[in-house]
Amino acid sequence: MELNKYIDHTLLKADATSADIKKICDEAIKYDFKSVCVNSCYTSLVKKSLENSSALVCTVVGFPLGAMSTKSKAFEAKTAIEDGADEIDMVINIGKLKEKDYDYVEKDIQAVRDATKGKVLKVIIETCLLTDEEKKKACEISVKCGADFVKTSTGFSTGGAKVEDVKLMKDTVADKAMVKASGGIHSREEALAMIENGADRIGASSGIKIVEG
């Protein structure tokens, strides 16, 4: 198994500097990771840093709370793509999901989907804040909107990826979308457990540790 090709090499901390971002790009090239995942202000820097590699540019949108306006999310996604993003990881509006305003949640995702045509869209549902039924509903709405992936977590809330959530999400989306596990995955064993239970992609800041075992 080419574990490196499952890894979105990630740095989303508020205090990340341009030098830090360049460093993870160099690491992504060295280890041949699938992508580098960053906040949107660094999209163009990552694009430039990865121009001679196969690694993709992944940018987060509405991160980490998902509570910004739909127009703002769509604009951030559109701008990220203009700056060179190949993939967009957006956060759903969690509060609206929990109050069962599914129409809002759908329109929110759809607006970002419409702004990202031709690019990969991953929808972060923040599993640690949801019941199993809410997780299923979030996955169903994401699929309905044409998301390419559903993703467990931001890594900035009360918990990260769990094997049981990955399995639930995979069972829900079946072959209609892929699953990205992220948040708290620090070892090869943890990454393999996620993959064995349905994860198609791993988001981690510990990518080197994961592939080196």
Curated annotation (Swiss-Prot):
Reaction equation(s) it catalyzes: 2-deoxy-D-ribose 5-phosphate = D-glyceraldehyde 3-phosphate + acetaldehyde
What CDD domains does the record point to?
DeoC
What broad class of enzyme is this? Answer: lyase
Q: Could you tell me which pathway this protein works in?
A: Carbohydrate degradation; 2-deoxy-D-ribose 1-phosphate degradation; D-glyceraldehyde 3-phosphate and acetaldehyde from 2-deoxy-alpha-D-ribose 1-phosphate: step 2/2
**For this chain's UniProt record, which GO biological process terms are given?**
2-deoxyribose 1-phosphate catabolic process; carbohydrate catabolic process; deoxyribonucleotide catabolic process
The keyword Glycoprotein appears for this protein? no
Instruction: Report if keyword Lyase is assigned.
Output: yes
One GO term of the cellular component aspect?
cytoplasm
The record's Gene3D superfamilies line, in alphabetical order, gives: Aldolase class I
Domain of life per record = Bacteria
Q: Where in the cell is it found?
A: Cytoplasm
Catalytic residues identified in the record: 89, 151, 180
Q: Name one Pfam family in it.
A: DeoC
Q: What is its EC number?
A: 4.1.2.4
Q: Name one GO molecular function term.
A: deoxyribose-phosphate aldolase activity
Which key words tag this protein in UniProt?
Answer: Cytoplasm, Lyase, Schiff base
Q: What is its main location?
A: cytoplasm
PANTHER family reported for this sequence: DEOXYRIBOSE-PHOSPHATE ALDOLASE (PTHR10889:SF1)
Q: What does this protein do?
A: Catalyzes a reversible aldol reaction between acetaldehyde and D-glyceraldehyde 3-phosphate to generate 2-deoxy-D-ribose 5-phosphate.
Q: Which family does the similarity line name?
A: Belongs to the DeoC/FbaB aldolase family. DeoC type 1 subfamily.
UniProt name for this protein? Deoxyribose-phosphate aldolase
- Organism of this sequence: Finegoldia magna (strain ATCC 29328 / DSM 20472 / WAL 2508) (Peptostreptococcus magnus)
